[in-house]
């Protein structure tokens, strides 16, 4: 997937928006990219777009919409109450359940270090997290509460979500949202990708990394095809 991402960056501007924090981006995105190439075409938006990083010789933070101390206390208290009220208690967890990411507080039902195989089978229909989210919506009416990934619930400041990140992309890069194509796995109501679709950005829903790989391969093929000169397209093929 990293080689595909590199290929895509060489053709078109690319932005990665995820619920993960900057250290995860460094490990899972930046460190995996093949060496060489121009990183100026890559924008990274951790914690659901509440942070923005761009490359200019080094990775630089453009903004970070951080919580105040009192907001953090309110959100953490609400999480503990909602989790208890929903009666959700996994048999085994891997690492901390709640992580303060500065501009986002994230609940990971099986823990931050849970194996992917365990995460994907824990709540495939989102039913467990919906119970918790419904309680959080009542407790945190002044915040954005979204489900993401396989086991997570993300809380950000009101209106500071992935759609906010898209608006920042349009203003910073000078690219209209009508020129964008978004790929995500939580485009349903309540998912952390849903605000992007609501903002009017053309979106493609994917199920898993392999599904995402196929979509990216198709995008690259279509973009490359559009760059071929008409006379080159009409050249006959040698079938010998």
Where are these regions (language model features)?
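Active-site phosphate-binding/coordination module
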Residues: 2-94
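Short, well-ordered coil/turn elements that cap or connect secondary structure elements
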Residues: 9-11, 39, 140, 175-177, ...
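Short, solvent-exposed loop/turn segments at secondary-structure junctions
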Residues: 22-23, 51, 112-114, 151-152, ...
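Short glycine-/acidic-enriched loop or helix-start segments at secondary-structure transitions
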Residues: 25-27, 56, 117, 192-193, ...
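A short acidic, often aromatic-flanked loop/helix-cap motif at beta-alpha or helix-coil junctions
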Residues: 50-54, 152-154, 210-214
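Conserved acidic, metal-coordinating active-site core of Asp-based
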Residues: 90-181, 192
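Mg2+-dependent phosphoryl-transfer enzymes with acidic/Ser/Thr/Gly-rich catalytic loops
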Residues: 156-158, 162-240
């Amino acid at each position: 997937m990293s080689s595909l991402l590199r290929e895509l960056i060489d053709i078109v501007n690319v932005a990665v928006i995820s619920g993960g924090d900057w250290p995860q981006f460094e490990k899972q995105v930046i460190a995996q990219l093949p060496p060489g190439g121009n990183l100026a075409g890559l924008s990274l938006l951790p914690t659901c777009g509440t942070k923005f990083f761009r490359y200019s010789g080094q990775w630089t933070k453009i903004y970070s919409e951080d919580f105040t101390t009192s907001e953090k206390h309110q959100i953490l208290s609400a999480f503990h109450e909602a989790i208890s009220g929903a009666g959700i208690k996994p048999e085994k967890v891997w690492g901390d359940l709640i992580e303060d990411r500065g501009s986002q507080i994230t609940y990971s039902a099986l823990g931050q270090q849970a194996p992917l195989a365990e995460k994907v089978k824990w709540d495939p229909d989102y039913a467990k997290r919906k119970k918790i989210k419904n309680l959080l919506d009542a407790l945190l009416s002044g915040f954005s509460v979204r489900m993401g990934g396989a086991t997570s619930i993300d809380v950000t400041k009101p209106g500071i979500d992935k759609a906010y990140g898209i608006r920042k992309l349009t203003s910073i890069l000078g690219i209209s949202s009508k020129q964008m194509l978004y790929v995500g796995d939580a485009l349903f109501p309540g998912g952390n990708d849903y605000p992007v679709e609501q903002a009017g950005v053309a979106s493609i829903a994917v199920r898993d990394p392999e599904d995402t790989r196929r979509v990216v391969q198709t995008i690259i093929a279509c973009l490359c095809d559009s760059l071929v000169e008409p006379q080159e397209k009409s050249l006959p093929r040698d079938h010998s």
